A protein has these predicted regions:
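N-terminal secretory signal peptides that target proteins for export/translocation
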Residues: 1-11
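Bacterial N-terminal signal peptides
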Residues: 14-27
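Active-site nucleophile/metal-coordination loop of metallo-enzymes that catalyze phosphate/sulfate
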Residues: 34-59, 72-162, 178
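A long, amphipathic alpha-helix that forms part
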Residues: 44, 55-57, 198-213, 230-271, ...
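Metal-dependent active-site segment of extracytoplasmic phospho-/sulfohydrolases and closely related
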Residues: 64, 82, 250-288
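His/Asp/Glu-rich, glycine-adjacent segments
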Residues: 116-238
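Active-site neighborhoods of enzymes that stabilize oxyanions during catalysis
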Residues: 153, 298-405, 409-420
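Polar, surface-exposed loop/tail segments
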Residues: 321-323, 329-347, 424-453
Length: 455
């Protein structure tokens, strides 16, 4: 009897140990739909969205890449061979693409994927205040960035997921939040400390290849990838510095590696490479708005001014009107229509618009806080006044006619164009497929909506 009890106890201990080892082993295995080939230098979060529909599995693929701060003329200036080759084999904008105002990173990245001007999708700056919420948004605040209630519109990844198509988004602004009821099936969390490391650069390519190697029911058909260079170098050293030129060629080499990797998959992939804005050498010291007006009664975020009193708005507007020539001041409702920046209270009121590459802010830091001069390179300006703000556009693939060039166009028009290539029905947007329809093999037939209703 004692021997039997000892046997049972031994069996139980062995079984528990075996189960623990098995559980540990299972935890290290990829979940269904995952790949064991993902590069851990850029961890991906997997959301359990429904598999690709039969309709989605028949569609082509689009890989959208953004090179932050890659000015419209960098490729030709620095002989970026891979980007120029992409343009020769497909389409490009030799004179650049027009960013939306303000020509800043978060507003324009979200414009590219929603087709909405910043005043309509809500990201009116990289950082701003919302009077209705009595809260601030900042691109450096993880809590705000991952809160989908800040964003309006249906980004391409939400559009795809809502119509039965998987998407994978690698570091694109806005992709860490649930927006329009969806998250991308795959996404990566942004880590400013590591995202530009050589390991993270290689991981982008490795993970795209691994994603495209998934089974058809799991494979994403829309992939978006964000790179922070050459924006950093442009800010720190200026757009014409040797360091910036080196970063331009570095990113061109990354595009070359990505293109070669995509070609090896044998899939029908349209590769689209854009930037969010350009870069210009800043002129002069900070322009502090409180040097020209008494901002008592105002909150401020950067150059954006917020007051609860209409009397304060009128007073400061009249004071700023008499100011120096480096900016023009408007009441919010009177901001010129061509800027598409006169409807959203998040933009502040009054609104100061720089007339050149001048660094504007409400006021210097409070006493005791460190102040810094403006960065050597800057952006955020109206491209009509500062043409260096123009962005880049290159694309090639089975849906794109070769040897095409396009005149400068507004970046809101990318959204319906990419949606068309994926056969998606676009959400309401400020763009038009007609602008880029002539670059498509099918000439944009059967759109503005979509070529066939997904089922």
């Amino acid at each position: 009897m004692r021997d039997s009890s000892r046997f049972v106890a031994l069996f139980r201990r062995s079984f528990i140990a075996f189960a623990a080892i098995a559980a540990l082993f299972a935890a290290q295995l990829p979940a269904p739909g995952q790949s064991s080939n993902f590069n851990p230098a850029l961890p991906l979060t997997h959301v359990g969205n429904a598999p690709n529909s039969a309709w989605a599995q028949r569609q082509h693929y689009v890989v959208l890449v953004s090179l932050d701060g890659f000015r419209w003329d960098y490729a030709r200036r620095d002989r970026a061979e891979h980007l120029l080759a992409l343009g020769r084999h497909g389409v490009w904008a030799p004179e650049g693409m027009l960013p939306s105002y303000p020509s800043l990173t978060f507003p324009n990245h979200f414009t590219i994927v929603t087709g909405l001007y910043p005043e309509h999708h809500g990201l009116v700056a990289n950082s701003f205040y919302d009077p209705a919420r009595n809260a601030r948004y900042s691109m450096s605040d993880p809590k705000a960035v991952t809160d989908g209630s800040w964003y309006s519109g249906a980004p391409l990844w939400s559009l795809a997921e809502s119509q039965g198509m998987h998407a994978a988004i690698l570091l694109w602004p806005g992709s860490e939040a649930e927006i329009a009821g969806f998250r991308p099936t795959w996404y990566a969390h942004f880590d400013a400390k590591t995202e530009a490391s050589p390991e993270a650069l290689q991981a982008r390519i490795d993970n795209v290849v691994a994603l495209l190697d998934l089974a058809p029911e799991d494979r994403p058909h829309f992939i978006a990838i964000y790179y922070s260079e050459p924006d950093h170098e442009g800010h720190e050293f200026g757009p014409d510095a040797a360091e910036t030129r080196k970063a331009v060629l570095k990113m061109d080499a990354e595009i070359g590696k990505l293109k070669a990797a995509l070609d090896k998959t044998g899939l029908s992939i349209d590769l689209v490479v854009v930037s969010d804005h350009g870069m210009v050498r800043s002129e002069g010291p900070w322009i502090n708005l409180d040097s020209f007006a008494d901002l008592k009664g105002f909150d401020a975020v950067g150059p954006l001014l917020y007051a609860t009193s209409e009397d304060d708005r009128v007073r400061v507007y009249n004071q700023l009107k008499k100011a120096a020539s480096q900016f023009t001041v408007y009441r919010l409702k009177n901001v010129p229509a061509e800027l598409n920046y006169n409807q959203n209270p998040r933009s502040g009121d009054p609104v100061a618009v720089a007339t050149g590459p001048y660094a504007i802010r409400a006021h210097a830091p409070d006493a005791g806080l460190t102040d810094h001069p403006p960065t050597i390179g800057m952006h955020g300006f109206d491209p009509a006044k500062v043409p260096e703000m123009k962005a880049s556009f290159f694309a090639a693939g089975p849906d794109i006619l070769p040897g095409k060039t396009v005149a400068p166009f507004e970046n809101v028009n990318l959204y319906p164009w990419i949606a068309h290539m994926l056969d998606l029905k676009p959400a309401k947007n400020d763009g038009s497929l007609n602008i880029l329809a002539g670059t498509l093999v099918d000439n944009g037939a059967d759109q503005e909506n979509n070529r066939s209703n997904p089922e």
